[in-house]
Amino acid sequence: MKHAEIPPPPDAAAEVFGPALGAARRYAEILAGAGVERGLLGPREVDRIWDRHILNCAVIGELVEAGERVADVGSGAGLPGIPLALARPDVHVVLIEPLLRRSDFLREAIEDVGIECSVVRGRAEDRSVREEVGPTDVVVSRAVASLDKLAKWSSPLLRPGGRMLAIKGERAAEEIEEHRRALAALGVSELKVERCGARFVDPPATVVVGFQATAPEKRPRSGRRQR
């Protein structure tokens, strides 16, 4: 198959990725090559591979703290997890993907690009996946499902006080109102919309942020004396 020509990275990419720019360029080549061949990226997306896909995902690093453990649910072609790992080598990213052909692609991609990510094959809601991944500080996702489903998958992976970051579109605020009650039932609250990367991508990435409730404080039963 003849691969589409990949546009050069915009100037912003050098600032976002720093010394990892070469690795980001290699990832763009993989997406435009094997990613298109395996049906993980549409061929028409190659022309906007930087702004719409790679940079759009990388800039959510603005919402992640150094040293945090991040899980990417339904990672697919590695978006947003791989660009985030490239832009933020100070965090550890786990890519979660249920389909074998996609998880194989992810393993091949991270080895080729040369970044330290983990790949876990399975569904985020599966107990075995939760046990393998362990408690995480942040769960990220992009174009995977509605907010209520994302919260159902993300919540069990998050430590108390952890955050769900979902890259969404123009309806982000409407989705929050539509699913607020369902998210609250799962312990996800303090919902808000953040815009990331205004200096690097136009339009900025739209991210729904939700916080996992902390464990309720245990109090002695009324009438019982503490010892």
Curated annotation (Swiss-Prot):
Top-level taxon: Bacteria
Binding site for S-adenosyl-L-methionine: 74, 79, 124-125, 142
Keyword set includes Transit peptide: no
Gene Ontology cellular-component annotations: cytosol
Pfam family, one: GidB
Subcellular location: Cytoplasm
Record's keyword annotation contains Membrane: no
Enzyme class: transferase
Keyword line: Cytoplasm, Methyltransferase, rRNA processing, S-adenosyl-L-methionine, Transferase
EC number per UniProt: 2.1.1.-
Chief site of localization: cytoplasm
GO MF term list: rRNA (guanine-N7-)-methyltransferase activity
The family this protein is said to belong to: Belongs to the methyltransferase superfamily. RNA methyltransferase RsmG family.
Role noted for this protein: Specifically methylates the N7 position of guanine in position 518 of 16S rRNA.
Protein's recorded name: Ribosomal RNA small subunit methyltransferase G
